[in-house]
Amino acid sequence: MTRKRALQPPNPIHPGAMLLEEFLQPAGKSQVAFAREIGWTRARLNEFIKGKRGVTADAALDLAAVLGTSARLWMNLQATHDLDVALRRRGSAA
């Protein structure tokens, strides 16, 4: 009996990368300007964009309020990212 090797999930996309690529860059908005708008420090925003900081419930509410999205979108993006990272670490996909 042969065992099929599970496929690796694609490279996990961090919600910060999504923010940069789908919201800030298309709008031509700098990190400095967006940090001011959302009420975060530039350092906090930069850490989020670089994937060094995750989405918390409060951050999701901030993002939703400024971007006109839902907080659940940001929480779901973070949960999906975390699951993909865990699956890659274990070497399998569910």
Across the structure, where does each feature detected by a protein language model lie?
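A short, Lys/Arg-rich alpha-helix, primarily the initiator
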Residues: 2-29, 73-76
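Short alpha-helical DNA-recognition segment
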Residues: 28-47
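The DNA-recognition helices of helix-turn-helix-type DNA-binding domains
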Residues: 41, 52, 67, 78-81
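Short, basic-rich loop-to-helix N-cap that marks the start of a DNA-contacting helix
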Residues: 52-65
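Short, charged recognition helix plus adjacent turn
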Residues: 72-94
